[in-house]
Amino acid sequence: MASAPEVESVKTPDPASTKTQHTSIAEIHTADQTWNNESNTRLPPNHRHHLRDTRYDPWTHNGSPPAEISKIPPRAKVLILGAGYGGLLFAVRLLEAGFQPSDILLVDAAHGFGGTWYWNRYPGLMCDIESYIYMPLLEETGYIPSAKYVPGEELRSHAERIAQHWGLGTRTGFGVRVEELRWDEKGIRWDVRGGRTQDPTMRWTCTADFVIIATGTLNRPRVPDLAGLDMFTGHVFHTARWDYNYTGGAPGTPALPRLDGKRVAVIGTGSTAIQIIPQLAKSAEQLFVFQRTPASVGLQRNRPTDREWWEKTIQNAAPGWQRRRAENFNAWISTPHEVLGIEEDLISDGWTSAPSFAAAIGGPLNLAPDFLHRATEVDAARRRIVHQVIETTVKDRRTAEALLNHAHGWCKRPCFHEGYFETYNLANTLLVDARDHQLHLTHDGVQVGDTVYPVDLIVLATGYELGSLCPATRAQVRIVGVGGQQMEEKWARPATLHGIMTRGFPNLFFPGTSQAGVTANQSYMFDRAAEHVAYILHALCLRRGTETRLRLQPTVEAEEQWATRSVDQARAFAATRACAVGSYTIAARYESADGAALARHLPWGEGMASYVRVLEQWREAGTMEGLEIVSE
């Protein structure tokens, strides 16, 4: 077994600095202050150091070579950016609406289907949303997930299954990074420019009548500006580009044989870190975990899918079971249980047991006068349970106290795992509490204060660049609309129709979070947006004939009315104003914005169910209210 970690010098922490903070309602202001203090010590976000150009695809050797870029069609009726779950859902809903495969073209910078599940293949990877509601189109494909929470390889394989089921393989261009979308007013189309992901000198152009941006948000690995990073002589990589050539092993296999005798550092303790840390501890000689703000980690209680239960409960259910189950989940995470008024909790996991997360995603009671008090009370109870698990699991008292998370549950996405806290009982694993120090790299290690921790490998579990919510920024695409206006200019004061269209950028759809409903299950969000866009394009294109050229965009009045309606719900997210900069909450990312500007970037405050009802009512009316439609 590996030996206990060794360091060059040891600085004994002040016991007073690690004193446990309790989180009862009476002392919640203390927890707020603790979180505010922690926020000031987070990793500096700017001056990106690209260890390896993120265009590099380490998985190309695992699949068939991408088609020659010249063979990717230069013309599409509907161009979809992204071939992950989001892009696939848009393609499938369009096909169901009556479009032909030849009408659709998907392009992706990756060399295979899966989106974030293509790029992320680190050891221990799995979804943290129940697979029965997260893996899309289970009902249509007939696939039965292997477990309540499935590993990453199964998630990626399911994306390939969807593509094969609907014949999308021949309608997808892989290894293509779109760089610019430019509206051609005369041609009533989008001119698309890009190039090979790994060789931008190989150019690709395309024209499309309609463009859908379905790239998601987890597509830009965040590499912090660590002092001394350039002088470190060991190996470094980001979890989104796991280097199995260095660690040994392969995706889907837990063993990392080449780490035998290696000293490994993990920087970051978010949702990715809590999955890789137990795996690294099994293989590394020594493991150092550098933590600034502890994660809130609840028990996941994963289990294999019971086939008898599946046949009885799922296969015999009426059509639409997956959507109903997903909406049950949405309700339970956004509404206090005592006022829910719906059937049983079908998911029954860590997410649905603590609905205080509604403070981050919106909900039907968020605008009630007592919401903040109610959410704080529920969240304090959740936090006490997590603290009790830590205190009864982790043997070393200082380590246990350092692992106590004092933040509100809505400030960072909660984590769920089995075995994370137990890892800190292993002799070869050391938690380094770095909340009071900036990290510095030396030529052979990581320095915190006066202590240097010698390491051979640094794994950056530092997440993704969230930054602006602008569709162009999220997709890393320059979008130029009518009259040369750039999307970033429009997004300084965004106005949309339904959160997916904006005036000045005709025939462009961009599902996101601003002025739209959100939930923890992103697959559900994509599916509702895909359903809505498919309805619009079916009604306007197929009913008028495929040869009709259309120019559609919101009217000025309609998008301002929608923006105002969304802004009126902004106080639903008042609780997130206290969250630290660097968390994923929108208010934190727009800390310098005034209230009116910030409110336009926020989601639909009344929650996902309210948002979906509004879209359904709009479609039922059948009038295309708010759309300016010009046909030739």
From Swiss-Prot:
RNA-binding in keyword set:
no
One molecular function GO term is:
N,N-dimethylaniline monooxygenase activity
Renumbered to this chain, the Polar residues biased-composition regions fall at 15-24, 31-43
Q: Where is this site: Transition state stabilizer?
A: 413
Q: Which GO terms describe its biological process?
A: terpenoid biosynthetic process
Where is the segment annotated Disordered?
Answer: 1-50
Q: Which residues bind NADP(+)?
A: 126-128, 269-275, 292-293
At the top level, the lineage of the source is Eukaryota
What is this enzyme's class at the first EC digit?
oxidoreductase
Catalysed conversion reaction: protoaustinoid A + AH2 + O2 = berkeleyone A + A + H2O
Please list the cofactors this protein needs: FAD
Q: What is its EC number?
A: 1.14.13.-
Tell me the cofactor note.
Binds 1 FAD per subunit.
Report the pathway entry. Secondary metabolite biosynthesis; terpenoid biosynthesis
| One Pfam family hit | FMO-like
Give the UniProt keywords, A-Z.
Answer: FAD, Flavoprotein, Monooxygenase, NADP, Oxidoreductase
Q: Does the keyword Kinase belong to this entry?
A: no
> Which positions does UniProt annotate for FAD binding?
116-119, 128-129, 134
| Family to which the UniProt record says this protein belongs | Belongs to the FAD-binding monooxygenase family.
Its annotated function is as follows:
FAD-binding monooxygenase; part of the gene cluster that mediates the biosynthesis of calidodehydroaustin, a fungal meroterpenoid. The first step of the pathway is the synthesis of 3,5-dimethylorsellinic acid by the polyketide synthase ausA. 3,5-dimethylorsellinic acid is then prenylated by the polyprenyl transferase ausN. Further epoxidation by the FAD-dependent monooxygenase ausM and cyclization by the probable terpene cyclase ausL lead to the formation of protoaustinoid A.
**Remaining remarks:** In A.calidoustus, the austinoid gene cluster lies on a contiguous DNA region, while clusters from E.nidulans and P.brasilianum are split in their respective genomes. Genetic rearrangements provoked variability among the clusters and E.nidulans produces the least number of austionoid derivatives with the end products austinol and dehydroaustinol, while P.brasilianum can produce until acetoxydehydroaustin, and A.calidoustus produces the highest number of identified derivatives.
**The protein, known as:** FAD-binding monooxygenase ausB
